[in-house]
């Protein structure tokens, strides 16, 4: 989980803009209820470990915004105010197979601080926030990467195009021109992320109206766009493969700057498919929560006023409580509302990447109410836990493989066609269970095999020393039915059939 440290002075300055007095003791005592863990607090600041699902808490500005609502009952709207801008960015159609999702925004008149120390601290905080988003939402820049630029150094409109690896420009922290290939071979960021462009003859660059490269996503910015102590107007670009991750990343950077007084302006993007997009979209997302689901999970009826107050603490809004007029006559799923059933219409911020399902709204309401306030009733029926029939076999398999020096891992059951079949050069031998409305391109199906997940893990760690030996015993879904499978994979310099046979024989002997 990402760990961040925020200075007391930074938090105090941000809260004072809204007439709130900062209380470090209150933060240390209650902030953990919101979705993070206070690791340490000293005279200089507070160190916080943020849960993986709360990517909206990774900057001091967004954390202060969340704390305003949660700790101080200061209502924060679930929308981000975005004014209509005039700057455009044209995206070449060739980017569809290189890096198809391209978004941008302008933020002007940001208050970066009153002293050089405050402005330097702001720049460092902005860069840290950017890298934390790369790590979490961006999956190490694979799904989304962010570029932040000094707008005063740019000449709009902008163009995104594909260039060959001989194309030259001066990258960040360098004083001379380098070719794309030289950057990938020798620049620190180039060598770290070159694998994201592996096998591509052409790579993406963003240029301004006079042909200067301001960004080479997902690797490095141009040197002339560097953010300095004098920068108050910003241009943000976000590129990647996952539209939802890119949108959330863009909104969170804009939100951080808006919390410092910045005015967010939209950009007109002529996308890879020829459609015109106006981004960012600061409007809240609307969700439907069946009252039946809320009552069943929380154990009783929750009044609308309590729901409204709880959602406001979490940065959301209860729009209305009404009777459902459409949907199935009778629903077999808790999350679906039937005709005639009472539902709650809820707005949550579009940058809340973790709100995927109505059950997430139940969690938001429970957190806003406070788990200590939900009651302490116990079940009148006492039951004893009994191991499942397969539990002993699974334990023996894991123990056998672990005793052979193979590390046990646990990967996600959700996967996609590329990992499960295309990269493995396999064809599906069973019916594939697909997600009806996938939130991300990474998770579109339920896995049929475990081995592709292990291969993906080894591929991600190919830069680390060998040997690497991993195994997993877990569930797969074939022909829409769950089943248990075991797989192991070893990356070794001298690996061969004899080693694989030895592992199989040892496992058979132990069973």
Language-model features, listed with the residues they occupy:
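Generic N-terminal amphipathic, Lys/Arg-enriched alpha-helix
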Residues: 4-15
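N-terminal structured subdomain of primase-like DNA metabolism proteins
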Residues: 15-21
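Extended beta-strand-rich architecture
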Residues: 2-6, 25-27, 33-36, 41-44, ...
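Function-determining surface determinants
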Residues: 47-49
């Amino acid at each position: 989980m990402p760990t961040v440290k925020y200075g007391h002075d930074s938090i105090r300055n941000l809260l004072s803009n809204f007439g709130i007095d900062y209380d470090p003791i209150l933060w240390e005592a209650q902030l953990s209820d919101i979705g993070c863990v206070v690791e340490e607090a000293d005279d200089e600041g507070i160190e916080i470990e943020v849960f993986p699902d709360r990517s909206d808490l990774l900057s001091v500005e967004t954390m202060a915004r969340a704390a305003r609502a949660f700790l101080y009952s200061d209502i924060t709207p679930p929308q981000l105010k975005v004014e209509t801008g005039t700057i455009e960015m044209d995206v070449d159609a060739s980017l569809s197979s290189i890096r198809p999702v391209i978004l941008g925004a302008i933020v002007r008149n940001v208050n970066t601080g009153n002293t050089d120390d405050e402005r330097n601290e702001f720049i460092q905080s902005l860069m840290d926030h950017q890298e934390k988003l790369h790590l979490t939402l961006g999956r190490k820049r694979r799904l989304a990467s962010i570029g932040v630029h000094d707008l005063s150094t740019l000449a709009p409109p902008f163009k995104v195009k594909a260039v060959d690896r001989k194309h030259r420009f001066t990258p960040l922290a360098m004083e001379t021109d380098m070719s794309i290939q030289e950057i990938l071979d020798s620049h620190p960021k180039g060598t770290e992320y070159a694998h994201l462009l592996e096998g591509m003859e052409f790579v993406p660059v963003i240029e301004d109206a006079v042909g200067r490269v301001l960004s080479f996503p997902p690797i490095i910015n141009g040197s002339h766009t560097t953010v300095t102590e004098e920068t108050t107007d910003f241009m943000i670009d976000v590129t990647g493969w996952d539209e939802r991750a890119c949108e959330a990343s863009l909104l969170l950077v804009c939100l951080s700057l808006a919390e410092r007084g910045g005015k967010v302006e939209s950009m007109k993007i002529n996308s890879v498919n020829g459609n015109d997009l106006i981004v960012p979209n600061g409007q809240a997302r609307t969700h439907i929560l069946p009252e039946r689901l809320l009552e069943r999970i929380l154990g009783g009826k929750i009044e609308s006023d309590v729901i409204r107050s709880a959602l406001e603490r979490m940065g959301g809004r209860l729009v209305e409580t009404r009777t459902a007029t459409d949907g199935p006559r009778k629903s077999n799923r808790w999350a679906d509302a039937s005709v005639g059933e009472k539902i709650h219409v809820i707005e949550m911020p579009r940058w809340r990447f973790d709100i995927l399902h109505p059950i997430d709204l139940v969690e938001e309401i429970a957190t806003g109410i406070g788990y200590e306030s939900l009651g302490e009733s116990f079940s009148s029926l006492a039951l004893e836990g009994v191991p499942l029939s397969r539990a002993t076999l699974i334990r023996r398999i894991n123990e056998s493989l672990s005793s052979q020096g193979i590390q046990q891992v646990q990967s996600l059951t959700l996967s996609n066609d590329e990992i499960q079949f295309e990269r493995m050069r396999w064809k599906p031998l069973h019916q594939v269970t697909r997600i009806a409305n996938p939130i991300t391109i990474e998770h579109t199906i339920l896995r049929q095999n475990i081995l592709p997940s292990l291969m993906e893990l080894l591929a991600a760690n190919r830069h680390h020393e060998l040997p690497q030996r991993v195994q997993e015993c877990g569930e797969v879904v074939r022909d829409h039915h769950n089943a248990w499978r075991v797989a192991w994979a070893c990356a070794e310099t001298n690996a061969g059939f004899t080693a694989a046979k030895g592992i199989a024989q040892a496992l058979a002997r132990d069973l």
